[in-house]
A protein has these predicted regions:
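Early transmembrane hairpin module of multi-pass membrane proteins
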Residues: 2-141
């Protein structure tokens, strides 16, 4: 018979809302800076309307590669779904590390979420720091 551990500590109930707030906060911050004209930039050699190194034409909008940038919302949604499912999961005392909110499951879900903003910064800005954020997110995953 498996012993069940009900997750009812106060911090476990806050993990999903915190991940949701951080994700929406990033999007709000990015879009706000985009409307203010702070974020969009161009890498040297890139020409508006020409295909970039990642097969999408470079745009003048706040997202230099709109499809590549916005498709990264899928990673954010997937990571948020992971946090939601994990926060509702009943953990067995002898279960593996991906049942419930364990350090490894939270790290994995957090890395999945960060893949979205990291890649979005690269495809959205075409800057060196955006490329750095993208590389960091892939290494973290």
């Amino acid at each position: 018979m498996h012993d069940k551990i009900k997750m009812d500590s106060s911090w476990e109930g806050r993990v999903f809302p915190l991940a949701l707030i951080v994700s929406f906060g990033f999007m709000f911050f990015y879009v706000s800076l985009g409307f203010l004209g702070v974020i969009p930039s161009l890498e040297p050699g890139a020409v508006i309307g020409e295909a970039s190194r990642w097969c999408e034409r470079v745009s003048t909008s706040m997202f230099r590669e709109p499809v590549n940038a916005l498709s990264n919302l899928g990673f954010m949604i997937t990571g948020l779904l992971m946090f939601w499912v994990l926060s509702k999961d009943v953990r067995s005392a002898d279960s593996n590390q991906f049942h419930g909110l364990t350090p490894i499951s939270m790290l994995y879900a957090g890395a999945a979420i960060y893949l979205g903003p990291g890649s979005m910064l690269m495809h959205g800005t075409h800057t060196d720091w955006g490329q750095w954020a993208d590389n960091l997110s892939m290494v973290m995953y």
